[in-house]
Amino acid sequence: MNLILMGLPGAGKGTQAEKIIDTYGIPHISTGDMFRAAMKNETALGLEAKSYIDKGELVPDEVTNGIVKERLAEPDTDKGFLLDGFPRTLDQAKALDTMLKELNKKIDAVIDIHVEEDVLIERLAGRFICRTCGATYHKLFNPPKVEGTCDRCGGHEFYQREDDKPETVKNRLAVNIESSAPILAFYKEQGLMHTIDGNREIDTVFSDVKKIIDEN
């Protein structure tokens, strides 16, 4: 079973990925892990990627695609894999199709965990931090026991990181929505696309994920 897992930040993709791996025993192939392994092992492509990352530049598609292909050629992917964080662009999706054909493999299903934008903003923009000790809270999922008082140090001053502010979160989501739309359309055209409502209990969402995997 060869899967691609998609979903916007805050949709619970990481949690579902863990459950898929635990249940089906297939390798979790995430872009971050692939880059780290390629750089640690000092492969030619890993060193090339490192040269861009060290300069704070985006790694070009041909380098990323090469690292992905090297990983998908490893024997542990022969019985299936879960791709997470790739493809990020339509060009990468097309390149993935080509490399899988060369490896005599194919994608069986693309699962998109869909959560409404306002819910994602609520989830992502709810984090705040104690200015005194750095303890992290979330207004919905992990508020202080006493409102306005830090559980750890008793401080009363809190702040939000720039990344967690609603406007920043909104902009980040807009960029993600725009870049993922052509990829979703590409896989829909191939009849591989499955969209799941992610605004439910984790196990309920996974029950739907499992159904899709078992039917493929």
UniProtKB/Swiss-Prot annotation:
List ligand-binding residues for ATP.
G10, A11, G12, K13, G14, T15, R127, T136, Y137, R200
**PROSITE patterns the record matches:** ADENYLATE_KINASE
Entry binding sites for AMP: T31, R36, E57, L58, V59, G85, F86, P87, R88, Q92, R161, R172
The catalytic activity, as recorded, is: AMP + ATP = 2 ADP
Q: Which GO terms describe its biological process?
A: AMP salvage
**So, what pathway does this thing act in?**
Purine metabolism; AMP biosynthesis via salvage pathway; AMP from ADP: step 1/1
- Chain sites annotated for binding Zn(2+): C130, C133, C150, C153
**Has UniProt tagged this entry with the keyword Cytoplasm?**
yes
Function statement: Catalyzes the reversible transfer of the terminal phosphate group between ATP and AMP. Plays an important role in cellular energy homeostasis and in adenine nucleotide metabolism.
This chain belongs to the protein called Adenylate kinase
Lineage of the organism = Bacteria, Bacillati, Bacillota, Bacilli, Lactobacillales
* Gene name as annotated: adk
